[in-house]
UniProtKB/Swiss-Prot annotation:
InterPro entries: GDP_Man_deHydtase, NAD(P)-bd_dom, NAD(P)-bd_dom_sf
GO molecular function: GDP-mannose 4,6-dehydratase activity; NADP+ binding
Cofactor: NADP(+)
SUPFAM superfamilies: NAD(P)-binding Rossmann-fold domains (SSF51735)
Organism: Sinorhizobium fredii (strain HH103)
One of the GO biological process terms: 'de novo' GDP-L-fucose biosynthetic process
UniProt-recorded name of the protein: GDP-mannose 4,6-dehydratase
Recorded catalytic activity of this chain's protein: GDP-alpha-D-mannose = GDP-4-dehydro-alpha-D-rhamnose + H2O
Pathway info: Nucleotide-sugar biosynthesis; GDP-L-fucose biosynthesis via de novo pathway; GDP-L-fucose from GDP-alpha-D-mannose: step 1/2
Amino acid sequence: MTDRKVALISGVTGQDGAYLAELLLDEGYIVHGIKRRSSSFNTQRIEHIYQERHDPEARFFLHYGDMTDSTNLLRIVQQTQPHEIYNLAAQSHVQVSFETPEYTANADAIGTLRMLEAIRILGLIHRTRFYQASTSELYGLAQEIPQNEKTPFYPRSPYAAAKLYAYWIVVNYREAYGMHASNGILFNHESPLRGETFVTRKITRAAAAISLGKQEVLYLGNLDAQRDWGHAREYVRGMWMMCQQDRPGDYVLATGVTTSVRTFVEWAFEETGMTIEWVGEGIEERGIDAATGKCVVAVDPRYFRPTEVDLLLGDATKARQVLGWRHETSVRDLACEMVREDLSYLRGTRQ
């Protein structure tokens, strides 16, 4: 056990944290995860890999923590002495960041600084490698298409602004202290583990529910927003690859293919056997079930962002050339996988 690498994951109960923990355990790591104390259980994504800590074979351990508590983070890093830290924890919902901008900055921006400072204060600069979950939202009002590691940033939300600070403080600690610290600028990545407040999961869950008669209408904001969507399982492998390099760096992970929310909706409903036809314009536009004539998709202005990000498209050339990373799952296959999982869940047949 003592010869195994040790990893610490903040945000372990989220989509990426769950897939990453699974990957690291498969690679032979001892994995420590940080989870927040919550009023409801939020560990369902990792229950299948959790082991009782008294089990002599246990390699996965959970610690209560919070990115807003520096002494807590310092204690966890000191206790675990990780070879690699994956900082995935964040208030990661763009719309919510407009409602909780101060908390978002505290957790996402200063939280990253707290983790870096823990490494520095504990004298782990030459032992611990650091991965920071950056985001394509940094590009915001995109200055060029596609976006790569050299594209100027133009954040358009409190979330993106907080992540911009986190990005640059990682670069600063890398240059100032020689820390092996890397930013993964990940474009949108989804999966059946995606939270239901995110648009892709909202769409697939609604398509499944409507097809089963459990929901009437799916309400969305900007149907023409375009995103570069990939599969989260493939993206967490890219995170791990960054920490295996001799030299740290910043990498875009993306598919290089853009898809509109509208098209994602059509694919999701197609997987349930429904065909969507669009009528009307602007906020009056509706998606109609071609077979029944019923409205199943409608626009709700409340879901429009105060400052919209219309088009994000990533260029992952550097990741392909340096890391050997590639995406494999098409966005259509991803949408279908998510719908099938939601159908199984709603029917009560999910394993």
